[in-house]
């Protein structure tokens, strides 16, 4: 045991300097609207995110989806999170998100809810890793300069914990950062998170710091 605090290097996402141990407000549907984000910034959040936004809603110009793109200068740094199950709508949604001026565009490959994952979006994408990787590659190519990040899980279930493979393949197509929920889709939000597996991903020499 040491009384000295652990020293962490300052965190960066692409060229975005976030300092030592930044506090992130996760994107949450029906929670992280502009008022809530503003309040969390006031109380110390370093990075905030919009609610996740449907790519189908954006390309159809659905008012509810377009409303979620609205961000303010006071929120920065701020990320916009998108989700969907088809490559072309996701690439177009990423372009629309970039036009709103966020600091980060995040792809949701982690939502376990049946109405999302059951259609192949969110964590449902973990059942088709080649599609997940190709979608991510196309999104990275679709935007001009905004860093693209991904949120995902350990795998679909205990027999398919493939996050180590996924992390390397997503890194290879150009993501700037990866957030891992330490459970499988089958667990949803139940049971223990597997911090050991997250640590293996982080400490893999093939994975950039």
Language-model-detected regions and their locations in the chain:
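Serine residues within intrinsically disordered or low-complexity segments
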Residues: 2-3
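Flavin-dependent oxidoreductase catalytic cores
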Residues: 7-209
């Amino acid at each position: 045991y040491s009384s000295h605090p652990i020293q962490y290097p300052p965190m960066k996402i692409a060229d975005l300097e976030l300092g030592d141990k930044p506090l992130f407000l996760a994107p949450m549907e029906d929670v992280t609207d502009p008022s809530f984000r503003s309040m969390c910034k006031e109380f110390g959040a370093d990075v905030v995110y919009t609610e996740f936004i449907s790519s189908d809603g954006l390309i159809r110009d659905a008012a509810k989806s377009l409303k979620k793109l609205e961000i303010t200068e006071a929120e920065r740094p701020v990320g916009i999170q998108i989700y969907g199950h088809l490559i072309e709508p996701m690439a177009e949604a990423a372009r629309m998100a970039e036009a709103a001026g966020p600091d980060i565009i995040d792809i949701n490959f982690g939502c376990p809810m049946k109405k999302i994952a059951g259609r192949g979006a969110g964590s449902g994408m973990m059942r088709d890793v080649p599609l997940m990787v190709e979608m991510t590659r196309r999104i990275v190519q679709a935007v001009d300069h905004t860093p693209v990040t991904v949120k995902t899980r350990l795998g679909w279930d205990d027999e398919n914990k493939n996050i180590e493979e996924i992390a390397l393949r997503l890194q290879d197509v150009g993501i700037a950062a990866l957030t891992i929920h330490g459970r499988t889709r089958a667990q949803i939000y139940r049971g223990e998170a597997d911090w050991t597996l997250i640590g293996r991903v982080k400490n893999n020499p093939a994975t950039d710091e």
